[in-house]
């Protein structure tokens, strides 16, 4: 029973970290990275489809992405989707492919993005702590129903705290790495 609670808490915390990593990957740094376009969608045969599912997105150099659609007619739609996204990018249509230069971030925008990183990370930490609270509540419920002893409950809560500390440290490491990427000029 206790092991199930611990495994469930750890799995849920890991999923929270994955979501945080995805959210942080969407925040644009000064460098080109294909994940920047992961949430940009186009209308493809009547459904909203991510660009990454209809084209190859490659890094041409540190500040330029190359997009090669699998169907020639999609270049215009992809260009329009990138322009209308909130990323502030201006792609160049080369006919059968696109080039997306990454403009350098100014100091003010960098600071805004660092604040956004901190906010996203704090949301991740709160989610992890909520999972800890739920797991501790489950442990207390078992103790209340006399299914485990007080020593077992204390040990389980200590283990949950260790898992929580480890996951929060990983979230902080993701944030620090992203902040460093943002501050590179």
Swiss-Prot record:
MF annotations from Gene Ontology: ribosomal large subunit binding
Gene name of this polypeptide: frr
Presence of the UniProt keyword Protein biosynthesis in the record: yes
Protein name, as recorded: Ribosome-recycling factor
GO biological process terms held by the UniProt record: cytoplasmic translational termination
InterPro entries hit by this protein: Ribosome_recyc_fac, Ribosome_recyc_fac_dom, RRF_sf
Similarity comment: family membership: Belongs to the RRF family.
Taxonomic lineage: Bacteria, Pseudomonadati, Pseudomonadota, Gammaproteobacteria, Thiotrichales
Cellular location(s): Cytoplasm
NCBIfam families reported for this sequence: frr
Sorted UniProt keywords: Cytoplasm, Protein biosynthesis
Protein purpose: Responsible for the release of ribosomes from messenger RNA at the termination of protein biosynthesis. May increase the efficiency of translation by recycling ribosomes from one round of translation to another.
């Amino acid at each position: 029973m206790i092991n199930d609670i611990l495994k469930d808490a750890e799995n849920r915390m890991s999923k929270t970290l994955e979501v945080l990593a995805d959210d942080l990957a969407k925040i644009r740094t000064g460098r080109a990275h294909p994940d920047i376009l992961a949430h940009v969608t186009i209308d493809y045969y009547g459904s909203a489809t991510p660009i990454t599912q209809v084209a190859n997105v490659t890094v041409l150099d540190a500040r330029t992405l190359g997009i090669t659609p699998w169907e020639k007619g999609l270049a215009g739609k992809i260009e329009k989707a990138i322009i209308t996204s909130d990323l502030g990018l201006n792609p160049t249509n080369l006919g059968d492919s696109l080039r997306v230069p990454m403009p350098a971030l100014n100091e003010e925008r960098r600071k805004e993005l660092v604040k956004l990183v901190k906010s996203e990370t704090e949301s991740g930490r709160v989610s992890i702590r909520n999972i800890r609270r739920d797991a501790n509540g489950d442990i207390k419920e078992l103790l209340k129903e006399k299914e485990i002893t007080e020593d077992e409950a204390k040990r389980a809560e200590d283990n949950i705290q260790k898992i929580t500390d480890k996951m929060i440290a990983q979230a902080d490491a993701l944030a620090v790495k992203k902040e460093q990427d943002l501050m590179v000029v």
